[in-house]
C-alpha cells in the first residue's frame, strides 16, 4: 500500500487542506482536501464516528470550563445528557444564556429547571 500512501501525500500536498467550507475555483462548496460537498455521501458509520468525536469535544469543553467543570460532573446522568443534547443543538454559548435554568441545576432544583 506504499503507492497509496504516496498518492495520498501527493494529493494532500497539491490540494491543501481546509477544515472549513470554501468555494473552489469552479464555485462549488468544498471542504477538506478539495472534496466538493455536492459529491459527498456520509454513511452512518462515518456519521457515528463524527458524533462520537463531537461529544468528546463537548465534554472536554464542559469539564475545562471554570464554572461548569466544578458542578457538572456531580449531576445525575439524565441531567448531564440533557445538557449535552442542548449544547449539541444550540451550542455551549447558547445553553449558557439559560442562566436561571443553569442555576436551578447547580442547586439541584431539577423541577424548577425543567
Predicted regions and their residues:
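Acidic, aromatic-lined catalytic clefts of primarily extracellular/periplasmic carbohydrate-active enzymes
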Residues: 1-114
